[in-house]
Every structure is written in structure tokens, then in C-alpha cells.
Amino acid sequence: MCSRGGSNSRPSDYETDALPTELLKHTKDVGEEKQTLHQIFADSMVIKGYSTGYTGHTRSSPGDLVIHKRELIFSHNIVIIVSPIYMISFIILLHYQSWHFSIY
């Protein structure tokens, strides 16, 4: 009967809704900045959240989605900055522990 993976599958799970061209254009060039990897990641999260309703924002207002995208970029920047700090301190701690135990 249904050619999309089973009789109980909903088409909305497999295909996205049509996005407004303004939102697509806005996610491609936000302030004409150079898109780094985490910005592309945030763009894809916004488009997925907008088309499937996973974000907590309403579908009728693209401004909320832009704010949500900027929050994603900000939180991802914090992860990129903080992760090496924890890694370096962990390596220093391991080095100190091995040096400390090698004395005795």
C-alpha cells in the first residue's frame, strides 16, 4: 500500500516540509560571514528543527529560529574553547601523577 518503508510509517518522518526561501537564504549567509564547521552544523540543526518541529519554537516566526541558531553557535563555540582546556589539564595531571609515583 504505502511505498515509504511500511504501512505505519508517516511521510513526515522521512521528508521535510517546504522551507520559506527567506529562511533558507538567511541561514546560508548570516551577515555574509565565513561559514565555519560549527556554523554549518548549527544551520543544519535549525533546518531540521524547523522542518520537523524538534525545536521549542513556533514554525510561523523565522526570527526565533535565527535566535536559536545563534544560541547553538554560541554553545558550540564554548565547547570548542573549553574542551582543549580540560584535555590539557588532564594531560598535565597524568604527567604529574606519573612523575610523582616514579620518585618512590
Swiss-Prot record:
Localization in the cell: Membrane
Transmembrane regions listed in the UniProt entry: 72-92
A single Gene Ontology CC term: membrane
Keyword Transmembrane listed: yes
Membrane topology: Single-pass membrane protein
Taxonomy, superkingdom: Eukaryota
Principal cellular location given in the protein's record: membrane
Keyword field: Membrane, Transmembrane, Transmembrane helix
Protein name: Uncharacterized protein YJL007C
Source organism: Saccharomyces cerevisiae (strain ATCC 204508 / S288c) (Baker's yeast)
